[in-house]
Amino acid sequence: MNLADLRYLQSPQGRALLAELAAEPLTPDTHLGVAARLRQRVEPEQAQAVLEMALLRQRAARKFSRAAEMVFTRDGLEQATAEPVAAHRAARFAAAGVGTVADLGCGIGGDALALAATGRAVLAIDRD
């Protein structure tokens, strides 16, 4: 994903298309048909960005309860800590009385989100 893709996905049109795709399961059997429909409505690059994000969000639903609101890259999702694991870690920080946490190399921020949910002050840093 590049910056232009991200901007498009956050635009009203991109959000609307993502919402449409969220309502239908994307499978290997439907993938090509959905891609063709999207390319009839938007530029090929935009269609690819929407389809890729919809697929990633569908996979991410196994890890994140709010996947439909999040933005993913394939690598980021594969490396992301699932919510239950992140919540367990965050609870341990809270129980230890840790007030501020620096999550260096945070990736998409699964651990940072869980830490923040426990009231920790979080500084999340990643190079990309």
Q: Which residues fall in each region the model found?
A:
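SAM-dependent transferase fold signal centered on methyltransferase-like domains
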Residues: 1-128
